[in-house]
Structure formats: C-alpha cells, structure tokens
Curated annotation (Swiss-Prot):
Its EC number is 2.3.1.5. This is Probable arylamine N-acetyltransferase 1. Gene3D superfamilies: 3.30.2140.20. It comes from Dictyostelium discoideum (Social amoeba). Belongs to the arylamine N-acetyltransferase family. The keyword Acyltransferase applies. One of its GO terms (molecular function) is arylamine N-acetyltransferase activity. It catalyses: an arylamine + acetyl-CoA = an N-acetylarylamine + CoA. Pfam families: Acetyltransf_2 (PF00797). Keywords: Acyltransferase, Transferase. The keyword Transcription regulation does not apply. The active site is at residues 72, 112, 127.
C-alpha cells in the first residue's frame, strides 16, 4: 500500500526527492533545500497579466504540473499542503516585509505568506520564498534571537518585539538576517529586518476543510496577496520582471552556491560566500529573446509566450516573429 497521498508524490517529483516519510526537523530541512533548488522566486504571471485566482488546484497546476515558479504565496502554500499531509502541526500566517534594498520602509502590508511549524511544543518559521534569503532549515521562534540558523546564503534568527507596527498591522516578532562572515561587503554582515509577523495568527486555506478539494473559493489569502502585489503603489513586484533562485555552479571542480538573478535587461550570479558578482547585460534590441533563453537554461522555467509591455517599451526594433507567439 502506498503510504503517500497523490499530492505528496506529485510534490516529491517536482522537488526531485525520492518519496520518504517526513517526520523530523532534519527531514523538513532536506525538503527546504530541495525546494530551493527547484522553486524560482518570480513574478512573471503578474508581469504578463496572466494571473489567476489562486485556489489549491490552480497552485498545483501552475507550479507542480506546468513547472512555473512564483512568489511567496505560491511556493510556501504548496509546502504547507505537503507537510500537512504528513500530519505535521503547521499553519500559515501573513507577514509584512521590510524593503530589502533601502531598509527604510515596509513593503506591502500583510503581503508575505510564511509557514509556522509547531514541533515538539516549539515554534519555527519555514520560508522557501523570501526571495533568495533562504535559511534552508526551520528557524526557531525565540524571544531573544539566541538560536541562529546558518545556511550557505546567510544567518537567520527570530526575535520577539513588543507591538511592531507595519503600516496598519501589529505584529509580535521579527525575522532578521545577515550575510556570512566571509562576505566582502562589511555592511551586509549587520543584522537587518526581513519581515514582521505574529506566529499565532492562523490563515485558513482553500481545501483545509474539504478532503475532496472541490472548494471553489477564489478569495483565498493567496489571491488577496497577489492582488495586493498588483495594486501596490510602490510597484515593487508588479512592473519589472524578476526571477531569482539558488543554484550550484561548478568552478575548478569545486561546487559554489550562487544566487542567480534575472531582470529585464541583465543576468547576475552572486557568490553566496563573498558577494562577488558576475553580470551579463542584454542587448537592448534583443531583450525578450535573451530573457527567455535564461528562463529556460538557468531557471528551468517555461518561456514567456506573451511579451509584456515593458519589453516593448525598451526597444523600437523588436523582432516581429517573436510578437506574442
């Protein structure tokens, strides 16, 4: 008898792990690492104006079947369903991210979806879609930040703070992160706020009370956050295309972890240990073709079929044979 649900088998196949029972923190960490190698943090459906209402079935279709990536509300939700099927005590909550470029303002209020794990009466944050700020292990939720998790990308901790106000939302904890000591940029080694959240706030999900998954609730938390991204006055994720993922690149027979980042007009590899960058700028008259080539070759994502307007705005010599083909 197969001990796994159809969804678990599908999820294991997508993250390229052999099916096994997930019951310990080490087991969960293996899943988080596998997710980081497969799931791309990207906003391409929003940029292409092809977004859908995000029910459980739609998320499965987009990310597991069609092998797309997505923002936090997609990857973290699929992880939630996967762990829930193993009987783990997990729920989702909504957070507010601090702007990761300036650290001078909050991003979209209540616009980040994370997972909270209650394991042996201790709470942990699990997040596989905070851009490429990935702990790759559950991060213990503590009052003083004394338990630090270190991954190849950086260090992570959770601290309790009294009455954190982010816009109109009030939270109780913050997740902080910094780069490793080997990083060449000194300022990046300072702790900064990633996001604020309340681990006891539970977000109910589509299909949670419906074993047959015939729920047609289109107003899910995931759909709500997606709409917040689209309507964001700061336009952090709704105008410029972005795809980023942790990758392993081989250099002189040594495996090095890098963050691959694809934008409208460039592709960048950032060394996780040192922060050193290798950047390739695209030819302005060939942006869309080069963008799609990198989606396929680096991120293993399907190419864009509809040309977003922002690409057309960048060049007057756009190849006719590429138009919305």
């Amino acid at each position: 008898m197969n001990p796994f649900t159809d969804y678990q088998v599908q999820f294991f196949e997508r993250i390229k792990l052999k099916p096994r029972i997930i019951e310990s923190l080490d087991d969960i960490s293996e899943v988080l690492v596998a997710c980081s190698k497969v799931f791309t943090f990207e906003n391409l459906d929003i940029i292409s104006n092809t977004q859908e209402a995000l029910t459980r079935k739609v998320l499965i279709k987009q990310v597991l079947i069609n092998k797309q990536g997505g923002l936090c509300y997609k990857a973290n939700t699929l992880l939630y369903y996967f762990l829930l099927d193993f009987g783990l005590n997990v729920h989702q909550t909504r957070a507010t991210c601090e702007n990761q470029e300036s650290h001078s303002r909050w991003n979209i209020g209540h616009g980040h979806m994370i997972n909270i794990l209650n394991f042996e009466n201790k709470l942990y944050v699990m997040d596989v879609a905070f851009g490429c700020n990935l702990s790759l292990r559950p991060v213990p939720i503590t009052d003083d930040g004394s338990e630090v998790i270190e991954s190849c990308i950086g260090l992570y901790r959770v601290i309790k703070r009294e009455n954190i106000v982010a816009g109109v939302y009030h939270y109780t904890h913050i997740l902080e992160h910094r780069k490793p000591d080997t990083y060449l940029i000194e300022s990046a080694k300072n702790w900064v706020i990633g996001y604020a959240f309340d681990p006891l706030l539970i977000c109910k999900n589509d299909g949670d009370d419906d074993d047959d998954d015939n729920n047609n609730n289109n107003n899910t938390h995931q759909t709500q956050i997606q709409q917040l991204v689209i309507d964001d006055p700061n336009k952090d994720f709704c105008v410029k295309p972005l795809a980023t993922k942790l990758i392993n690149n081989t250099d002189n027979n040594n495996n090095n972890n890098s963050i691959a980042t694809l934008t409208l007009n460039s592709f960048t590899l950032t060394n996780c240990k040192t922060g050193e960058k290798i950047k390739t700028n695209f030819d302005n008259d060939n942006l869309f073709e080069q963008f799609n080539q990198h989606l396929i070759s680096i991120f293993n994502l399907p190419p864009l079929k509809i040309i977003p307007q922002i690409f057309l705005n960048q060049t007057s010599n756009f190849p006719i044979n590429n138009l919305n083909s």
